[in-house]
Amino acid sequence: MAIKLINIGFGNIVSANRLVAIVSPESAPIKRIIQEARDRGMLIDATYGRRTRAVIITDSDHVILSAVQPETVAHRLASKAEEEDINEGEE
């Protein structure tokens, strides 16, 4: 299994294999998840001081804040998966 990396903005990259969810930060439950992660020391802020537009939850219970829209991150993830499928077909 190859390691797939996804750009989440400003040169920050996460492993696509570790992603569980990409969600919007607007709802109260997500805000609660962010605060709990901050309290546990499991929050990674990759916004560079900009507004949080996507919250990425990983399989290790880390919560990553990104200034990129969730749809953009999902599109990058989908295009990486599609690219991998094409490469496997060439082998």
Curated annotation (Swiss-Prot):
UniProt xrefs under Pfam families: RemA-like
Cited InterPro entries: RemA-like (IPR007169)
Family listed: Belongs to the RemA family.
UniProt-listed NCBIfam families: MtxBflmRegRemA (NF046064), PRK04323.1 (NF003315)
Name by which UniProt lists this protein: Putative regulatory protein CBO2514/CLC_2370
Organism: Clostridium botulinum (strain Hall / ATCC 3502 / NCTC 13319 / Type A)
